[in-house]
Amino acid sequence: MDYGKAASEKLGARIRGGAIITKYGHSGGPIRGIEIYEAGHPLPDSETLRATERILGITGSLEAGRMVLFLVSGGGSSLFEKPLPGLSLQSLTEITSALLLGGADISELNTVRKHLSSVKGGRFALHCMPTEIFQIT
């Protein structure tokens, strides 16, 4: 949320729209021009999918010359998620839960996630083409 507030304050009217996904109970109030969604963390849930679909909708119709500012802070890898076709949310959640219970660290978890996700491993950047995308983590 702090990233989003800072970006909104610094960029002002240059921001034409956007969305933030945060953990339940962490929205911290409205940000001008930005939609705020709360979703499951560390396990993705139906709100995770809804929020991710909204971001894909916003970014999927941008023309060349536009820019996507993609800000990711702690927890972002579970909050921005859409399973690959053929993989259910339930299966993804079960896999994630098993990894967490098995003691996987965040690097190991994210390595597996990128192979199961429609938005990780460069897939979100491809989705955003032909726009420029700037990611800050």
Please describe what each predicted stretch is.
Residues M1-T137:
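N-terminal loops that bind phosphate or other acidic moieties
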